[in-house]
Structure formats: C-alpha cells, structure tokens
Design a protein with these regions (language model features):
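Acyltransferase
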Residues: 183-252
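Cofactor-binding loop segments of dinucleotide-utilizing enzymes, especially the Rossmann-like FAD-
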Residues: 7-9, 34, 91, 179
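Conserved catalytic-core motifs of eukaryotic protein kinase domains, centered on the activation segment
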Residues: 61-64, 98, 108
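Short N-terminal binding/cap micro-motifs at the start of the first secondary-structure element
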Residues: 12-17
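Pocket-forming structural segment of enzyme catalytic cores
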Residues: 100-186
Length: 252
C-alpha cells in the first residue's frame, strides 16, 4: 500500500492539524502542490486515500489562475468510481460536487466566515464517519461560494439554515465538507490578514481570529476522531459492515 494522495490547492491551506491526526492514525501521506507546478497524478494505483484541500481558487466556472482544477476533478471521478476513500474540504468539496455534475455558485447568502455550528441530517445516523459526530458539531467557515445542487445520488449529512449543503457523501467512500476542520491559529491569522472579505463585512481581523481560536479545542474534540476513522477506512481497518454499499457511479 502506498501513501494517501493530498492535493494542496493553495499554500495557505495545508493539512495542518488534520495532517497531525492522520499521522497519529499511521496513514502515510504524499502532498501534491499543483500551484507550485507539481503535476496532478493521473494514476491512483496503490493509493489508500485521496484528500483534496481548500484555498482561494474557485470552482465557479474555469479559474485561469488554477488551470489544474479540471485534472483534480478527473482524479476525484476516478477515486469515487474505484471506491478509494476520499475527503474534500472547502474547495475540495466543491470540486467533488462539480466533478459529478453538482453545481457550485457564488453564495446568495453572502460570505460565511468564522466559527459556526452545522446540524446533522437523518442520513448521518448510518454513515460510517458521521454517525459518531455530535448533532451540532463546531466547525470553521471561510467561503464565498457554495454547493447549490448536490450530485445525483449524493447523501446530505449536515446542513445549516443559510447554506444547506454543509457535508455530503458520494458513493460509499467519498465525503465533502463545506467547512474547515484543519485550521490552527496561524492558518486563520494568515487568511484574515488583508482579507478583502473581512473588510467588506466590516469585521476586524483580530476579532475573527480570536473567535476562531476559541473553538479550536471543540473542533479537535469532534474532528480528530473523524479523521482517525477516515484513516482507519483508508487502511482497511473498518469492517465492511460499517460501510453501506451503494450503486457504482459512472466515471473513468
């Protein structure tokens, strides 16, 4: 078994705490940085998992500054088709959706920034990862785009009032999270520094950072076990009875 493939789409959004949790679970990782001219691998042979992170590029139409995104979409289609455990966060969740004919648009509700709660949906009760997540887990939000239509066959796992598609599963081994679980203080501080979104919202950067830092402990309490369970799935340590089978999705 090789290393889990991590696609890092932005130097300001790396694995950070998520990487620490996966290391604790003994999941080896290899990071691909397309923004630094790393080629997006076309082959997923021997990959136990695929993780696609967030960042400034947008999945709303072609992004000329991120010409690698179509290749990432193709990789996600292949991962889902071949039942490789997959996790998309932020932009990664958007790409998981658009790769399978979902829709991502600029959010009509406006930007969502800072700590928030999301609500689990009924389907989460039988999900191999979300079944252990609290009913209203703490998360961090930092986005202006949102998934407005899930791919056909996707299972909604978490929602909020103004942003209804907060988490979903596609097939039986691929998850998309609109929100962020990987952040630490330094990452949030970097995002806040000079943020035009915060300026538009008239939110002081230090206030937003402090609010995010206050919930980091709660986020770790919920999402560290989630990450460890994802790693266990990737390493083949979860019994098949924990994983609901679905019909295969079309893809290459």
């Amino acid at each position: 078994m090789g290393s889990a493939l991590v696609i890092e789409n932005d130097p300001t959004d790396d694995l950070r705490r998520l990487g620490e949790w996966l290391a604790e679970a003994n999941l080896p990782i290899e990071v691909c940085r397309p923004y630094a001219d790393d080629p997006v691998p076309a082959d997923l042979a021997d990959r136990p998992a695929v993780i696609v992170l967030g960042g400034r590029p947008s999945a709303v139409g072609p992004d000329p500054a991120a010409g690698w995104l179509p290749a990432v979409e193709g990789l996600l289609r292949k991962a889902v088709r071949h039942r490789i455990p997959t996790l998309g966060i932020g932009l990664g969740a958007h790409l998981l959706a658009t790769a399978h004919a979902g829709t991502v648009e600029r959010s009509a509700a406006g930007p969502e920034i800072g700590p928030a709660l999301v609500g689990k949906r009924d389907a989460a009760a039988t999900d191999p990862l979300f079944r252990y997540v609290p009913l209203a887990p703490d998360v961090l939000q930092w986005h202006v785009d949102e998934i407005t239509e899930l791919p056909h066959g996707a299972v909604l796992l978490a929602a909020s009032t103004h942003y209804p598609h907060q988490a979903f599963r596609l097939g039986d081994r691929a998850w998309g999270l609109q929100f962020h679980i990987e952040c630490d203080r330094d990452m949030v501080s970097t995002w806040a520094a000079g943020s035009t979104i915060l300026t538009e919202l008239r939110l002081p950067a230090d206030v937003v950072v402090d609010a995010c830092v206050e919930v980091l402990g709660d986020i770790e309490e919920v999402w560290q076990p989630f990450a460890v369970r994802f790693a266990a799935l990737a390493l083949g340590q979860l019994p098949d009875s924990d994983i609901p089978r679905t019909l295969p999705l079309l893809g290459s």
